[in-house]
């Protein structure tokens, strides 16, 4: 836990945190938590958490956490009913069911005016979200990206040290070790709410559900020179929250739709989609009748 107006470095660490967390809106139970106005750098490390809402990287207030050449892996555990029921955080302990996903752990959660920066890393959650924001502060007020991800692999599923004869969804060499990622479970790769802006450069994102959800008319996400894969819908705006999505010099494989815009009385935002020199491929077998749709307007199930 790093707090105050401090600067801290974590180098070549192997961090394991097992057991349920306490509250991923407050950072309780996180493997690395930074708040107030701290500057944390994590280099050449492996951080592994296992448990309900056992966040790996939590960034809040006006703090910044930079992760270089590291693996961040957050795993769900199968709590029995009584154990799960006794866990009572201030907000959520699983992804909202109305989003049509399952999962109980976010690998990264950025709140307030916090910043999480990833370089040449692998960020994986078995279910819910890998790179999440929640209750953020608008870019109009901060002038900084909540999430900035470069040269990294992120997704929903599992990760292990790569075995020579085994096929993986993606691999990434981190700190001299090649890791294999296998897509599975349920959830989204990344999220933008409350007017935050995110930027992704030369990333590879994989999800069985959504690559990204935007939940604010002022939110923005920019992808360049990247590859994104979704088994369902690549991008979704929640409750007609709107926002601006820019896809530049990238490739996307999806099955149902490129972008799904949900109606909703709670937010009256406008969605902006910019596709610039980007290939969109609707290959694969869709699980529904209607597929191959660039922009889909639907009634919200999360009004």
Question: Residues of each region from the PLM?
Answer:
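Internal alpha-helical scaffold/solenoid segments in large eukaryotic proteins
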Residues: 49-55, 126-128, 208, 218-221, ...
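Parallel beta-helix/beta-solenoid
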Residues: 6, 38-46, 67-71, 120
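Acidic/polar low-complexity surface segments
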Residues: 7-36, 61, 72-111, 127-191, ...
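Hydrophobic or amphipathic alpha-helical targeting/insertion segments
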Residues: 57-58, 62-68
């Amino acid at each position: 836990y790093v707090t105050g107006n401090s600067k801290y470095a974590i180098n070549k660490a192997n961090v394991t945190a097992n057991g349920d967390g306490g509250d991923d809106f407050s950072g309780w139970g996180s493997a690395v938590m930074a708040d107030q106005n701290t500057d944390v750098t994590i280099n050449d490390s492996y951080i592994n958490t296992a448990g309900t809402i056992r966040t790996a990287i939590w960034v809040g207030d006006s703090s910044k956490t930079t992760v270089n050449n590291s693996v961040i892996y957050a795993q769900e555990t199968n709590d029995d009913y009584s154990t799960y029921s006794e866990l009572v955080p201030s907000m959520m302990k699983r992804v909202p069911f109305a989003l049509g996903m399952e999962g109980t752990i976010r690998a990264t959660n950025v709140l307030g005016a916090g910043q999480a920066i990833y370089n040449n890393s692998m960020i994986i959650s078995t279910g819910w979200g890998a790179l999440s924001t929640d209750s953020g502060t608008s870019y109009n007020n901060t002038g900084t990206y909540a999430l900035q991800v470069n040269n990294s692999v992120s997704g929903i599923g599992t990760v292990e040290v790569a075995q020579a004869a085994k096929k993986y969804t993606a691999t990434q060499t981190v700190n001299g070790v090649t890791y294999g990622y296998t897509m599975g479970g349920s959830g989204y790769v990344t999220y933008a709410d409350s007017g935050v802006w995110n930027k992704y450069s030369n990333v590879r994102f994989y999800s069985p559900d959504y690559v990204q959800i935007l939940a604010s008319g002022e939110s923005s996400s920019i992808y360049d020179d990247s590859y994104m894969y979704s088994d369902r819908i690549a991008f979704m705006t929640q409750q007609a929250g709107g926002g601006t999505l820019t896809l530049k010099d990238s490739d996307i494989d999806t099955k149902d739709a490129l972008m799904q815009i949900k109606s909703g009385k709670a937010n009256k935002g406008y969605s902006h989609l910019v596709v610039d020199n980007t290939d969109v491929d609707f290959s694969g077998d869709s699980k529904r009748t209607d597929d191959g749709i660039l922009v889909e307007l639907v009634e919200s199930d999360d009004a």
